[in-house]
Amino acid sequence: DHRTDIWSFGVVLYEMLTGKLPFKGDYEQAVIYSILNEKPTLATAVKNNLPAELDHIFDKALAKDPQERYYRLDDFAAELKALEKQIEGKKAGEEPIRAKSWKKKLLFIGGGLVILIGMALLAAALFFKEKPKTIDSIAVLPLQNYSHDPEQDYFADGMTEALITELSKIKALRVISRTSVMLYKKSTKPLPEIAHELKVDAILEGSAQRVGDRIRITAQLIEARSDRHLWAEDFERDFRDILFLQKEVSRAITSEIRIAVTPEESKQLSTAREVNAEAHEAYLKGLYLINKFTETDLNKGIAFFEKALKKDPEYALAYTGLAETYDNLLFMSLVRPKEGLQKMKEYALKALSIDESLGEAHLVLSAVKMINDWDFPGTEREFKLALQFSPSYSTTYTWYACFMLWMGRNDEALTLIQRAQEIDPLSPTLRGFSGYCLYLDRQYDKAIIRIKENLALEPNVFDSSTLGCIYLQKRMYEEAIACFKKAIDYGGGVMSEKDLACAYAFAGKPAMARNMLANLLKQSSKKYVSPDNIWQLYWALGEMDNAVAWLEKAAEERSPIVIMIYRDPQFEGVLHSHPRFITLMKKVGLIK
């Protein structure tokens, strides 16, 4: 609302006349509290030679409710002009001492109130010119938990993620992802420094608090370059209206930063439904848990999402949460592929039947179409829908880039991963992913440099494993073995153990691979064992018929690795020339 600008200029004019700011506080949060909850100090109390009528003018300009402020700057100026005429009209008689004193001050600074108004309007022009026309990028820092109860962290984190999700629907706005902003939780870094690291124009910070059935969000917007407070507001609603509140805050932000919002985006930011309080609380707890990415927490998250749906069977976000959780379980090899894919499809379709604009649900469907259906045109359509509804969701760009790599469209993949890095600049996964792209593009030396840089910043399984694969391609077996050992140390589990066994086999020491293979085959007669590790061990031992036989089983189970291997350099050569492998790749659709 343009009346926010009236308020801002009121602050400037107040300071120009009194030499003081209208709202006081010993520290930043105290000033914000004063802005949101207290009336400004009377101008006449600060400078007793000012006319009392100015108190009324400032009271209106600085009103908490925008509806109570002047509608236009012209109206503001008109009241100042009227005040001047009122004082000028007293020239014929003896002016009150107070008016005389004020008039002298005005004459001193420019020759009367007309000059002051001219100065005010000039200051307004400069003030508004100084403000950026639009803010194109923003970071929502983790909202503070003002309940001081650690058990309520899930609520503050959930509200942070909700605001990121809502703002991410605006195509013209680059919104930094959750992964990067959560690194600043409880950070004491100055806001301009944070903004510089994230490369954003503005920072949104604030707090979230729940007391009984009421929720309160305090939000403030800071311009990154100048560290200037652009806007601050307090929002309070019943818990059942939490979805309305999230959209209300997001609308206020988009209005303040003057970003271009399409009619469809505006509709999304204006449409919400009441939600069962217990259902949403369970949903937030589930979301909090699945973001920890451990098997235990993922399964606990499922239980909370299911609890939410028992309270509200039409709660689309809970269905999306379930779909995303099974997606994570699938790619972490913690669920049988067919079971995971069936759950992903069921929950994503249910979510979209309630709300077709859920970008995250479209992203899950893209994985189903790619891995389960081998429908690659359909996969790309779902990726595009996901980006249409959530254009600042970095995970979509990341998986879309993976898909492009596996389809052999490397240049497009690199463009997508660059976009993901703009949204999620501090993600260690994305920093290392560019090394994986270079590996698939056979640029091994560049990939080694990139991955080593990332490992120096944050040791992790993915980069160590990719670096090991590169060394295998360069026949640097001792270096590869060292990388896979580190991957095991970082928590890579049985998959990293398999990689290490394969590396030893290529180095002419097949004993570990044979022992591991024998153990897995023995286990598979008693319980489910993923065929992924078995076929790769056969491959490393040079037993291609057995390798392809187990790869065919992996394809039957719809293992994601079937899509990933065709463009992977390490599987070229003997495997690619095997007739049954060629037949399988044609069936999948990777060979025309």
Give the predicted meaning of each segment.
Residues 169-172, 314, 580:
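Glycine-centered tight turns that cap/initiate beta-strands
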Residues 125-128, 134, 162-304:
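Catalytic-center loop of serine/cysteine hydrolases
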